[in-house]
Amino acid sequence: GQIGVVNFWATWCPPCREEIPGLIDVQKRLGPQGVQVVGVAIDSADKTREYAANIGINYVIVLGTMATVDLVRELGNKAGALPFTVILNRDGAVSGTHLGLM
């Protein structure tokens, strides 16, 4: 399995936008070694698609729903704040979380 870096973000979130270039770099450098970044956008499809294309995001982006906010809270982010990053080990288990800019 791969190591997963799951980043919950939104286009309207300044710290989210600030950390995306670093996530692009992680995917570029560590992707070949089995690291997969996945962005979960809490936003509209149109805004997400446009932003991802403009900045050149090189990793998978999926759209979250209101259930995503519940998931974030279950993972320890009680405020539901963004950005929020979850690290998954090669077995798919949560090995760490980080709230805020990385």
Regions found by a protein language model. Give the residues of each.
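Proline-centered helix-kink/hinge sites
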Residues: 14-15, 21-25, 60, 83, ...
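Hydrophobic beta-strand anchors of alpha/beta hydrolase catalytic cores
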Residues: 5-6, 37, 85
